[in-house]
């Protein structure tokens, strides 16, 4: 008596339909556990929380919401999602600390990490996208310095800019930037093995034999250079 039945389906925006549990959230939203992650439904939106980024595993068995925190039991362990108010500055500080502590940065460049198993852990990759990743970091530091005037941020921008310039100066072709630079004697990460068009990667040694630079630079890498370096000049 006085009850109502509501059906939520994929056609209504539900990201995944195979539900396992329901829970009322801390802001009167609905949490839905599924065999492929968890879903938060607000009045007119669905937020999806998948395995390995938000949760230890896919299958959700139960959900309990506390004060701005949600506990999600999965077949891989307990996932905890906590809601915290963030300013842009606080968010930037979080990711900058992540870059420093996890080892993304090297010689002014910003690199991708990949998981190499329990024995090796996270491994830094010297890859085709080093120039692009570094360009975006440089752009971010330029914008941050323009807003804050912080001297440490200026030094970060200068360090990344010098790495971008090095990519261009290490090649014998004026104006042509390398994709990546590998230290023959010092680097212990993973060197990219693939080149453009399905061909194997090729490293070109510098005259002193201490470095190798990777060519086959693509248009998006070149665009990244123009984008970041122009910001560095203007800001």
Enumerate the language-model features and the residues they cover:
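Well-ordered alpha-helical segments within folded domains of soluble proteins
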Residues: 34, 74, 129-145, 218-233
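Short loop/turn segments immediately following beta-strands, especially the blade-tip
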Residues: 82-89
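Extended ligand-binding groove/face enriched in aromatic
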Residues: 105-107, 111-117, 127, 155-235
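Loop/turn residues immediately N-terminal
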Residues: 1, 35-39, 76-79
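Short loop/turn segments that connect beta-strands within beta-propeller blades
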Residues: 2-4, 42-45, 84
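General structural concept
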Residues: 121-166
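Conserved beta-propeller blade signature
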Residues: 29-32, 69-72
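Short coil-to-beta transitions that initiate beta-strands within beta-rich domains
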Residues: 7-27, 50-67
């Amino acid at each position: 008596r006085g009850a109502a039945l509501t059906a939520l389906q994929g056609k209504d925006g539900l990201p995944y339909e195979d539900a396992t549990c329901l829970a009322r959230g801390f802001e009167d939203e609905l949490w839905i556990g599924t065999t492929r992650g968890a879903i938060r439904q607000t009045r007119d939106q669905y937020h999806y929380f998948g395995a390995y980024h938000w949760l230890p595993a896919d299958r959700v068995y139960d959900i309990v919401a506390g004060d701005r925190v949600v506990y999600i039991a999965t077949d891989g362990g307990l996932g905890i999602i906590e809601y915290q108010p963030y300013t842009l500055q606080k968010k930037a500080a979080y990711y900058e600390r992540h870059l420093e502590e996890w080892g993304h940065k090297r010689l002014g460049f910003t690199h991708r990490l990949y998981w190499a198993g329990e024995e090796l852990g996270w491994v830094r990759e010297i890859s085709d996208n080093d120039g692009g990743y570094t360009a975006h970091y440089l752009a971010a530091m330029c914008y941050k310095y323009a807003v804050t005037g912080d001297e440490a941020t200026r030094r970060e921008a200068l360090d990344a800019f010098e790495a971008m310039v090095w990519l261009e100066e290490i090649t014998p072709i004026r104006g042509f930037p390398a994709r990546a630079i590998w230290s023959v004697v010092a680097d212990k990460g993973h060197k990219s093995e693939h080149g453009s068009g399905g061909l194997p990667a090729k490293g070109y040694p510098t005259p002193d034999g201490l470095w190798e630079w990777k060519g086959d630079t693509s248009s998006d890498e070149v665009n990244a250079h123009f984008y970041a370096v122009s910001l560095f000049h203007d800001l």
